[in-house]
Structure formats: C-alpha cells, structure tokens
Amino acid sequence: MVTLDMIRKPVEGDLEAFEQFIRQKFTADGTLLSEMLDYALSARGKGIRPMTVLLSAALNAPAGQRSGGLRTLLAATLVEMIHVASLIHDDVIDESDMRRGRASVNARWQSRNAVVVGDYILAKNMDLGLKSGQFDLVTHVCGAIATLCEGEILQNDKANRQEMTRASYLDIIYKKTACLIGVSASAGALAVGASREKQALMRKFGESIGMAFQIQDDILDYTRTARTGKPSNNDLREHKVTLPLLTVLESVGEERRRELQARLARCHEEDESVEYLQHIVCLLYTSDAADE
C-alpha cells in the first residue's frame, strides 16, 4: 500500500525549506494577530497542496535544474495560504467549533476576529506574491480564490433550496477542493518553466486527485470520529448533502425523499435526526458508488 509518507519522501528536503519559508514570511505585529496567525499555521494538516507543487516541480524541472528554488517555494506558499484562509472562513460560515482535533480559530477568538485573520492571510499572501515580481505565478494562482467563493455560494444555494443533484455536487467539490489542487500541480510545473501543454496535463492530474480526495473525505465524514480531526456527521449537522446521502436520496421514492430531507433540516438542532440519517446512509450506501 502506498502511504503519504512514501509520496512525500522525494521532496522531504524541499518541504522542510517550505516550512522555513512560510514561517519567515508570515509574521505579524501585535500580540493577538501574531498568536492567531501562529495558531492557524500550526494546524495545516497533511500539506497536500504544497507537496503537490513540489512534486510537480521535481517532475517537470529540466535535467540538472534544482526544482525547489525560490519560485517553487513561492508557488507552494501561495496555494497553501489560500487554503488556510479558506478553512478559517469555512469554519465561520459553518459555525464549526473544531478543526483537526482542536478548537477552530473562530471558537477560540470569536468569528469577527477569525474573519479578519482570514482576510489578513489572503492580503499578506497576495502582497508576498506581488512584491516577489513573479507575476506569472500570482496570476496563475489568484483565479482559484474566485472559484472557491463560487463553490461556497453554490453549495449554500443548493442546500437552502434542497436542490442538490449529482451534477451540482460534482461542480461544488471541483470548485471548493479539486480546483486548488489542480492549480497546485500546474503551478509547480510553471515554476520550473514547463510548457503550457505540461502545465495543462498537471492541472488535469491534480484536479482528478482533488475530486477523488473530496469524495473519500465525504464518505469518511459518516464514519470517522473526532480523533481524526473532524467530528463524525459534521456534514449532516451543517445540512450539507454530499455523495453518500445524495446516493440514498436518489434511490428512494418521492415521499421517502421528502421525509429524509425534513430530517436533514433538523440536524443542526436534533442529534436524533443526525443519528437516524447516519444509520440510513450506512445501511443503504456502499463504496461502490464512490468507485463509480
């Protein structure tokens, strides 16, 4: 079985350089802001996006050229800090108290401060990119911010209208997850001077990984515990219709579907409805749908 550590191994040295780079560039004056920023940076998870940048750069660098240079570290930083800011904003929107097994930024410092520190990270990130003079990298990455916002609005609209379809679900996870991972892969290629054709291939590869990653993550939300860093059934509590529940809704009749949707609407207030839907999904849903 291929593990994340095995995938990470070829760029371990570059990842260490990236950590030093990001810590050096993201500092702040003021005790509260500095504390919040350090807290956000210390719980960034597995680092899938910067690792993707570095692996793509290593794959596409010309023979004899160092793939982990300043442009590559900058590209990795740009995508990672967009991701960090988006998670802070997501937790505010979803009123989530936990992030990766500990209190979220909004739970610890209130939502009003969390929104500002998320904005600060985005502003600091763009300032870093522009001052570097690497305008091609900044332009390449910036579009992902708008795409993330589009995905969030679409998800909220579909949830409020109870109109989630498989097509809209796939569109949402592309915009909220796969797009930035795709940009990470293509940014790594761009950083080392790869052709546009290779950049496009790397982006498609990254997007495919991102789609698979998010589908698996949505499945795990019905089974994992807080030990893994996110409460089980969190999507239900936030009224999010992801692939497991969507598959069940597609498989039942209209009357039964309305009943399940009514249960979903009460999940934020009722643990009983959460447990009921979790049981139904686990009973009727199999990993065959994810494979499809």
Please tell me what each predicted stretch does.
Residues Y285-E292:
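Conserved small/polar residues in nucleotide/adenosyl-binding loops
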Residues V252-R266, D271-H279, L283:
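Gly/Pro-rich interdomain helix-loop hinge
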Residues M6, P10, A43, I172-K175, ...:
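Short, surface-exposed alpha-helical recognition segments that flank or form part
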Residues M1-F21:
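N-terminal amphipathic/basic leader segments beginning at the initiator methionine
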Residues T3, G69, T165, R266-S273:
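A diffuse structural propensity rather than consistent per-protein peaks
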Residues E16-A17, R23-R257:
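Mg2+-dependent prenyl diphosphate-binding active-site environment of isoprenoid biosynthetic enzymes
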